[in-house]
Structure formats: structure tokens, C-alpha cells
Amino acid sequence: MNQQRLTQVILAPIVSEKSNVLAEKRNQMTFKVLANATKPEIKAAVELLFGVQVADVTTVTIKGKVKRFGRTLGRRSDVKKAYVSLAAGQELDLEAAAAAADKE
């Protein structure tokens, strides 16, 4: 796992009602990741980018929906989500991390 690959593994944080509840109650963060990313890569990427200890990573692949475009059927892309459990005592503030990245 080289550093360039690790910086590309995490595509975006997922901000939703469910992800906010998980962050508050279980200390879990939710990210959209590359479809071919592995759990060790995701763990290393979060630890590298945000400087926190990761306890566990759970992944799920959401299959793309079939959508109609006029007379033709199309399909949206599959999306892989990673639920990252932080170690006890660790906290991740995405707004502060984004502000720090903007300053650099």
C-alpha cells in the first residue's frame, strides 16, 4: 500500500441521518470508497488522512438502481460504503479536517 493509493481510496464522507446517528452513538464514520478498496487499505487511509486510531472496518456494496431514460433502460453505478469504527477515546471532526486540508 503506497501513500498515493491510500489518498485515493476514500472518495467522500457520507452525510445522512443514519450516518449522523452512527457517529454519535457508536463512534462510527461512514465513507464512500473505491469499489476495489480492501478493509486494510481503508483502515490505513483513515489513519493516514485523519490521524485517528481505527478499531474496525465494515464494508457494504450498494448495487446501482435500474433507471429508465426514455425508451432505454440504464443502470446507475454500484457504490461501496465503509463504516469505520474508531477506537475508544478517538474522535473525528470532518469539518475541522476539511478546514485543515484547505489551509494546506
Swiss-Prot record:
GO terms for cellular component: cytosolic large ribosomal subunit. Keywords: Ribonucleoprotein, Ribosomal protein, RNA-binding, rRNA-binding. GO terms for biological process: translation. One of its GO terms (molecular function) is rRNA binding. Part of the 50S ribosomal subunit. Contacts protein L29, and trigger factor when it is bound to the ribosome. Belongs to the universal ribosomal protein uL23 family. This is Large ribosomal subunit protein uL23. It comes from Neisseria meningitidis serogroup B (strain ATCC BAA-335 / MC58). The lineage of its organism: Bacteria, Pseudomonadati, Pseudomonadota, Betaproteobacteria, Neisseriales.
